[in-house]
């Protein structure tokens, strides 16, 4: 036995309490010659093998029955490649010793990770197939600076934490190990002896694939190839582009009718993608697909930020789905949740026995609304983990945009908290300065590294500058959900038409602040759950009036400045609330033509017409693109405005939000001439009453509303019409 190996060290190593396994295991120079040491539980015999010749150059002595072997090669002084021939249960196995390989992480990578400025930390941390010194295997690395010991456990070592303890890189707090023979498809986790001496089994924060819930292991999976964003996809995200988003929960869009099981990613590629294209949508927005343990969270409590959920297939199946969407001309938006994470033991919570990813004080680190933990954005490594994740989805999967969830909960320390339940920032204010800087930095990096990709904020307050560039004090998002518009307009639409005249401002107020941000008009999943009813069911009146109200509302929404977002099921007026455990009510579209078909046809026509006419989308965020023609006729609940493109072409939009047709309704126009009715939500095609203007109307040289020329229209009941100028 080497005099250098103390019995206490062997005991600590075997017990899993030794933090520096490379100082003991592997090949070491001693005065007696090269000494090879190995910890091989359950082995009976071990030889050192020279790979070139296959010759046994020495036998290791078992110094501890629990599996510690040691042997001196007296004629050898210089390190050489070797293997170990190990006899387990009477059978000899030839293995490469993990402890003969040097440090894995380059000094520059280690420094960047410590500084929190590594743009792509996922290329270094996690599990990566590799070849070292001619040996194939997988290199593992994990950030756990306060752990006393970390081991890789998995299918390749019987989930035994004694077999593969890792090397600590003290300068960065990262543990690393190359395990020969570990390969793609095998499951693994990290076993940590934490800062308090407790044993923890953790999934890899950087795992590229994970087990199907309720199992929680990570899976070795190669890093996807980089994806470049085409010029067409970049243009589709621009401010002047038509953007109509179909928001989808993959687990409940459609299910197998025989067993209510989910469609796979590939089945969704074959069914959802062509449907969204046929409907005329430009973008698909996916509720979070990051791995998550609880179906009822809809993905908004993720435990595997880098792993697409296995519910619908493999990582490569998900890439197939994204590619299919792109091939169909659809950009893909991913709901992204950097605001909080669940407290499940296998995930990030108290990762190394300390509050590593979250704040230690619950007034900063605990989200009482969702029973989740809040990221510590002030810790550089944590922010780096999240920023890297944003780039990962965009660069490795071709995600075109990220919609950031619950931004308000991130940027305000007192969000949903009473007095005494939150801690002010260093200046005594309520803003979370670290979260604000994190968002600015993330958006800045997206703009620099992935030209054409964009981000969208679900931000529910009046925080100033959400879509202003970081250098001018903004958060740097490209778009912001206009939740104020959504609440105001739905509050208006649910009113009996008799009372709408007293709430006219609900529809007009949005234009007072419309140009303060780059807005998306969202009718999202949040509006059809938790007792809010479906959008259809909020409409007043009998069945005919409900559908007419909904059609009029959609016609108003698609013409109003801002990009469009519609949650699945709303496009055919599903009558019940969304249920994540069941398919949409596709049976409503079965049988003969009905009101649901009418709404579906309307949404399809809205999308295609909206995309065709630049006036409806080119100047969403420019005051020149919108002008009221009639804004004060609250008694008749009539509103008329014009949309305009850069060339000055106009489309007139007129809405009548009462069930009373308005005949001979005169209003002034900017451009005299012949106007064609290009869309009428009351058309019989959509199961309306078919009241309208016979296709074409001509202006009169009669002054109205301060304009020299005017139109005299029939405004259908509970309807919106669009008119395009055809000529003089």
UniProtKB/Swiss-Prot annotation:
What SUPFAM superfamilies does UniProt report for this protein, alphabetically?
(Trans)glycosidases, E set domains, Glycosyl hydrolase domain
Q: Which Pfam families does the entry link to? A: Alpha-amylase, Alpha-amylase_C, CBM_48, GlgB_N
Q: What are the EC numbers?
A: 2.4.1.18
Entry superkingdom: Bacteria
- Give the first-level EC class, as a single word: transferase
Q: Which residues form the active site?
A: 405, 458
User: Which pathway?
Assistant: Glycan biosynthesis; glycogen biosynthesis
* Keywords assigned by UniProt, alphabetized: Carbohydrate metabolism, Glycogen biosynthesis, Glycogen metabolism, Glycosyltransferase, Transferase
Which reactions is this enzyme annotated as catalysing?
Transfers a segment of a (1->4)-alpha-D-glucan chain to a primary hydroxy group in a similar glucan chain
GO biological process terms held by the UniProt record: glycogen biosynthetic process
Q: Where is the signal peptide?
A: none
Molecular function per GO: 1,4-alpha-glucan branching enzyme activity; cation binding; hydrolase activity, hydrolyzing O-glycosyl compounds
Q: Which HAMAP family match?
A: GlgB
Q: What does this protein do?
A: Catalyzes the formation of the alpha-1,6-glucosidic linkages in glycogen by scission of a 1,4-alpha-linked oligosaccharide from growing alpha-1,4-glucan chains and the subsequent attachment of the oligosaccharide to the alpha-1,6 position.
Assembly state and interactors? Monomer.
Q: Which NCBIfam families match?
A: branching_enzym, PRK05402.1, PRK12313.1
Q: Which family does it belong to?
A: Belongs to the glycosyl hydrolase 13 family. GlgB subfamily.
What is the official name of this protein in its record?
1,4-alpha-glucan branching enzyme GlgB
Q: Which organism is it from?
A: Salmonella arizonae (strain ATCC BAA-731 / CDC346-86 / RSK2980)
Record gene name? glgB
């Amino acid at each position: 036995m080497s005099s250098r190996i103390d019995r206490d060290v062997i005991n600590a190593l075997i017990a899993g309490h030794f933090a520096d396994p490379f100082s003991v295991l592997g090949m070491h120079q001693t005065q007696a010659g090269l000494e090879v040491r190995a910890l091989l539980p359950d082995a009976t015999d071990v030889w050192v093998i020279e790979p070139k010749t296959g010759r046994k150059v020495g036998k290791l002595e078992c110094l501890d029955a629990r599996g510690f072997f040691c042997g001196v090669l007296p004629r050898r002084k210089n390190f050489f490649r070797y293997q170990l021939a190990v006899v387990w249960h009477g059978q000899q196995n030839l293995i490469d010793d993990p402890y003969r390989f040097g440090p894995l992480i380059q000094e520059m990578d280690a420094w960047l990770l410590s500084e929190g400025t590594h743009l792509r930390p996922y290329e270094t941390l996690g599990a990566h197939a590799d070849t070292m010194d001619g040996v194939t295997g997988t290199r593992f690395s994990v950030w756990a600076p306060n752990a006393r010991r970390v081991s890789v456990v998995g299918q390749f070592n019987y989930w035994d934490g004694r077999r593969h303890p890792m090397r600590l890189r003290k300068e960065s707090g990262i543990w690393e190990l190359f395990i020969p023979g570990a390969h793609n498809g095998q499951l693994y986790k990290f076993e940590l002896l934490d800062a308090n001496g407790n044993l923890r089994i953790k999934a890899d924060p950087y795992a590229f694939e994970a087990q199907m819930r309720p199992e929680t292991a990570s899976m070795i999976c190669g890093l996807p190839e980089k994806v470049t964003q085409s010029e067409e996809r970049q243009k589709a995200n621009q401010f002047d582009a038509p953007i109509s988003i179909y928001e989808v929960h993959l687990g409940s869009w459609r299910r197998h009718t025989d067993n209510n099981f989910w469609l796979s990613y590939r089945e969704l590629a074959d069914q959802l993608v062509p449907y969204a294209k046929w409907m005329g949508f430009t973008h698909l927005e996916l509720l979070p697909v990051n791995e998550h343990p609880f179906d009822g969270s809809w993905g908004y409590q993720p435990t595997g930020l880098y792993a697409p959920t296995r519910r619908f297939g493999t990582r490569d199946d998900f890439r197939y789905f994204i590619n299919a969407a792109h091939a169909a001309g659809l950009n893909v938006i991913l709901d992204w949740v950097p605001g909080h994470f669940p407290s499940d033991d296998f995930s990030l919570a108290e990762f190394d026995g300390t509050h590593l990813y979250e704040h230690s004080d619950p007034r900063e680190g605990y989200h009482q609304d969702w029973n989740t933990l809040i990221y510590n954005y002030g810790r550089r490594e944590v922010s780096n983990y999240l920023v890297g994740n944003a780039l990962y989805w965009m660069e490795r999967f071709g995600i075109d945009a990220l919609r950031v969830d619950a931004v308000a909960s991130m940027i305000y320390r007192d969000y949903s908290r009473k007095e005494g339940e939150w801690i002010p920032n260093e200046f005594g204010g309520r803003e979370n300065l670290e979260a604000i800087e994190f968002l600015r930095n993330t958006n800045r990096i997206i703009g620099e590294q992935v030209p054409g990709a964009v981000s969208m904020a679900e931000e529910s307050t009046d925080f100033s500058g959400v879509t202003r560039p970081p250098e001018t004090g903004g958060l740097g998002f490209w778009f912001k959900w206009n939740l104020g518009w959504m609440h105001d307009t739905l509050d208006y639409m649910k009113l009996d038409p008799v009372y709408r005249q007293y709430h006219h401002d609900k529809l007009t107020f949005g234009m007072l602040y419309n140009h303060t941000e780059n807005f998306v008009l969202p009718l999202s999943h949040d509006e059809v759950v938790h007792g809010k009813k479906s959008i259809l069911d909020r409409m007043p009146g009998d069945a005919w009036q409900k559908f007419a109200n909904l059609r009029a509302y959609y016609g108003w929404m698609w013409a109003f400045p801002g990009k469009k977002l519609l949650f699945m099921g709303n496009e055919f007026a599903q009558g019940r609330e969304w249920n994540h455990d069941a398919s949409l009510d596709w049976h409503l579209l079965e049988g003969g033509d009905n009101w649901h078909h009418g709404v579906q046809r309307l949404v399809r026509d809205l999308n295609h017409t909206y995309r065709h006419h630049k006036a409806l989308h080119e100047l969403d965020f420019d005051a020149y693109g919108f002008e009221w023609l009639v804004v004060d006729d609250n008694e008749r609940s009539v509103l008329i405005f014009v949309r305009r493109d850069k060339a000055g072409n106009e489309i007139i939009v007129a809405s009548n939000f009462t069930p009373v047709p308005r005949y001979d309704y005169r209003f002034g126009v900017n451009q005299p001439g012949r106007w064609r009715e290009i869309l009428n939500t009351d058309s019989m095609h959509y199961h309306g009453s078919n009241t309208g203007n016979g296709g074409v109307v001509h202006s009169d040289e009669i002054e109205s509303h301060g304009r020299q020329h005017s139109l005299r229209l029939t405004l259908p009941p509970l309807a919106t019409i669009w008119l395009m100028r055809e000529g003089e």
